[in-house]
From Swiss-Prot:
The keyword Zinc does not apply. The basic functional RuBisCO is composed of a large chain homodimer in a 'head-to-tail' conformation. In form I RuBisCO this homodimer is arranged in a barrel-like tetramer with the small subunits forming a tetrameric 'cap' on each end of the 'barrel'. The modification N6,N6,N6-trimethyllysine is found at K4. The record marks K324 as: Transition state stabilizer. The keyword Chloroplast applies. This is Ribulose bisphosphate carboxylase large chain. Substrate binds at N113, T163, K167, R285, H317, S369. Mg(2+) binds at K191, D193, E194. It comes from Platytheca verticillata. GO terms for molecular function: magnesium ion binding; monooxygenase activity; ribulose-bisphosphate carboxylase activity. Keywords: Calvin cycle, Carbon dioxide fixation, Chloroplast, Disulfide bond, Lyase, Magnesium, Metal-binding, Methylation, Monooxygenase, Oxidoreductase, Photorespiration, Photosynthesis, Plastid.
Length: 465
């Protein structure tokens, strides 16, 4: 027959330490924890094999293709500092293994069956280098940062948002009322909670109508362009597009999608619809912590963020560094840059394993949301800079005088921080002082400062290098 049947070590075929990576290869950095007795080279090679062309035994049909052309290769392995039995395995995948413009297909290969592999105790995808040749097959974000600013006519400051709470249980009319109060008070955006879809207490069409009414009323009063993220996420792609179409017919500026629970295929379809029809697209990352929170297994959020930029979204939630949800500062800033910038240098101190060139794919605005309030404003302004959306749910609606004064307090705090920064003051050191000064002439801000002066969410971050 002319082929050698039987099982042979993966490392004989898939571990190639002298391989020179190509500009068109997709490169992956995996954190591998092998089972006791499995050498790291074999574990790394097994990952490369099982996520590309390999299977557990030699097969006759191997002779009908060119393994050299199509196989994934583990080209470098390094131990993880401070961990006994963990290694970073670098794998290069030939471009031809992937369907153009499909995040779904890319993930099915790279993070598919290989994560259940018995020879590994745990496996985590830490980073991906997407080559320009592959980036160019994606539309990416429907509009991007600059186009969004032009649509909204807002420059030189972060944008302000608020998630409407209680997240479930309000009727459509009361929901619209809450939206109106927040927007009238000075916020740029309000947001459907990620789990608001179309439930018995509030069907989607009613919510869309009342929110649109609130939006137009607030715009007329304030003379500013306003938005409400209408969550189009649904049980089927057809229903999702139907909701997006209705949003477009109402003339609203932005819709929203839960990209992990909704899935990459649905998300990419919606992103294409949004670009074709002039809608901005806000992305919520519900379910991300299931995938990214374990340090030794899963997928790091920076990879999910890159995947979203390819699939398409104009905003994505990315942690706060200071609020109630997970996020270590340098690492968060690393993937915030991956979302916004066109070219990002490799920087291991921020968890960035590869240089990434997005070749003019539009950028995504990071959204800081979760347990933040007016006292955090100086830190948020400093950490995230102008190109971001700062979202205060409880930090707006929890104001003792109601939603509109809560919105006023946040807007005053933000404008004070931006002004102080532009005057050259140090927000990190003088932040509290800046907020106190501003609260002297804003009773709304003074009341907010009083309510939240003692609140802290301080735990050790899990997401360390």
């Amino acid at each position: 027959v002319g082929f050698k049947a039987g099982v042979k070590d993966y490392k004989l075929t898939y571990y190639t330490p002298d391989y020179e990576t190509k500009d068109t290869d997709i490169l992956a950095a995996f954190r591998v924890t092998p089972q006791p007795g499995v050498p790291p080279e074999e574990a790394g090679a097994a990952v490369a094999a099982e996520s590309s062309t390999g299977t557990w035994t030699t097969v006759w049909t191997d002779g009908l293709t060119s393994l050299d052309r199509y196989k994934g290769r583990c080209y470098h392995i390094e131990p993880v500092a401070g961990e006994e039995n963990q290694f970073i395995a670098y794998v290069a995948y030939p471009l031809d293994l992937f369907e153009e413009g499909s995040v779904t297909n890319m993930f099915t290969s790279i993070v598919g069956n290989v994560f259940g592999f018995k020879a590994l105790r745990a496996l985590r995808l830490e980073d991906l280098r997407i080559p320009p040749a592959y980036v160019k097959t994606f539309q990416g974000p429907p509009h991007g940062i600059q186009v969004e600013r032009d649509k909204l006519n807002k420059y030189g400051r972060p944008l302000l948002g608020c998630t409407i709470k209680p997240k479930l249980g309000l009727s459509a009319k009361n929901y619209g009322r809450a939206v109106y109060e927040c927007l009238r008070g000075g916020l740029d955006f309000t947001k459907d909670d990620e789990n608001v879809n179309s439930q018995p207490f509030m069907r989607w069409r009613d919510r869309f109508l009342f929110c649109a009414e609130a939006l137009y009323k607030a715009q007329a009063e304030t003379g500013e362009i306003k938005g409400h993220y209408l969550n189009a996420t649904a049980g089927t792609c057809e229903e999702m597009i139907k909701r997006a179409v209705f949003a477009r017919e109402l003339g609203v500026p932005i819709v929203m999608h839960d990209y992990l629970t909704g899935g990459f295929t649905a998300n990419t379809s919606l992103a294409h619809y949004c670009r074709d029809n002039g809608l901005l697209l806000h992305i919520h990352r519900a379910m991300h912590a299931v995938i990214d929170r374990q340090k030794n297994h899963g997928i790091h959020f920076r990879v999910l963020a890159k995947a979203l930029r390819m699939s398409g979204g104009d905003h994505i939630h990315s942690g706060t560094v200071v609020g109630k949800l997970e996020g270590e500062r340098e690492i968060t800033l690393g993937f915030v840059d991956l979302l916004r910038d066109d070219f990002i240098e490799k920087d291991r101190s921020r968890g960035i394993y590869f240089t990434q060139d997005w070749v003019s794919l539009p950028g995504v605005l990071p959204v800081a949301s979760g347990g933040i309030h007016v006292w955090h404003m100086p830190a948020l302004t400093e950490i995230f800079g102008d190109d971001s959306v700062l979202q205060f749910g409880g930090g707006t609606l929890g104001h003792p005088w109601g939603n509109a004064p809560g919105a006023v307090a946040n807007r005053v705090a933000l404008e004070a921080c931006v002004q102080a920064r532009n005057e050259g003051r140090d927000l990190a050191r003088e932040g509290n002082e800046i907020i106190r000064e501003a609260s002297k002439w804003s009773p709304e801000l003074a009341a907010a400062c009083e309510v939240w002066k003692e609140i802290k969410f301080e735990f050790e971050a899990m997401d360390t290098l």
